[in-house]
C-alpha cells in the first residue's frame, strides 16, 4: 500500500467513523460506508487539507469510492 493510499484510507475512516479495515478500495462512501452528503463534503475538505490541493465541485462529485479518492490524490497532490 502506498503512502498516499494509507493516508486517504486513514482520513476516510476518521471522517466516516468506521474501522480502517472496512475501508477497502472498492467501497463506495454512501452505499458501503454509510456516508451522507455532509460527510462527503467534509471528506473532500479533509483530503484537500491533507494533500494541499483544491478539489473543484465538478471533480468532488466524481469522488464516490475509496479508489476514486486515492486516484485523485495521486494525480493532483502537490510535490
Swiss-Prot record:
Pathways involved: Lipid metabolism; fatty acid biosynthesis
Pfam families reported for this sequence: PP-binding (PF00550)
Free-text description of this protein's post-translational modifications in UniProt: 4'-phosphopantetheine is transferred from CoA to a specific serine of apo-ACP by AcpS. This modification is essential for activity because fatty acids are bound in thioester linkage to the sulfhydryl of the prosthetic group.
Residues modified to O-(pantetheine 4'-phosphoryl)serine: 37
Chain ranges of the Carrier domain: 2-77
InterPro entries: ACP (IPR003231), ACP-like_sf (IPR036736), PKS_PP-bd (IPR020806), PP-bd_ACP (IPR009081), Ppantetheine_attach_site (IPR006162)
Gene3D superfamilies listed in its UniProt record: ACP-like
Subcellular location(s) per record: Cytoplasm
GO molecular function: acyl binding; acyl carrier activity; phosphopantetheine binding
Record-level GO cellular component terms: cytosol; membrane
Keywords: Cytoplasm, Fatty acid biosynthesis, Fatty acid metabolism, Lipid biosynthesis, Lipid metabolism, Phosphopantetheine, Phosphoprotein
GO biological process terms on file: lipid A biosynthetic process
Family the entry assigns: Belongs to the acyl carrier protein (ACP) family.
Family matches, as NCBIfam families: acyl_carrier, PRK00982.1-2, PRK00982.1-3, PRK00982.1-4, PRK00982.1-5
Function description: Carrier of the growing fatty acid chain in fatty acid biosynthesis.
HAMAP family listed in its UniProt record: Acyl_carrier (MF_01217)
Protein name, entry field: Acyl carrier protein
Species lineage: Bacteria, Pseudomonadati, Pseudomonadota, Betaproteobacteria, Burkholderiales
Amino acid at each position: 500500500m502506498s503512502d498516499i493510499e494509507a493516508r486517504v484510507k486513514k482520513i476516510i475512516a476518521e471522517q466516516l467513523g468506521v474501522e480502517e479495515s472496512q475501508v477497502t478500495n472498492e467501497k463506495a462512501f454512501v452505499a458501503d460506508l454509510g456516508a451522507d452528503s455532509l460527510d462527503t463534503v467534509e471528506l473532500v475538505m479533509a483530503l484537500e487539507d491533507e494533500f494541499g490541493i483544491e478539489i473543484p465541485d465538478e471533480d468532488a462529485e466524481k469522488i464516490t469510492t475509496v479508489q476514486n479518492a486515492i486516484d485523485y490524490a495521486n494525480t493532483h497532490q502537490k510535490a
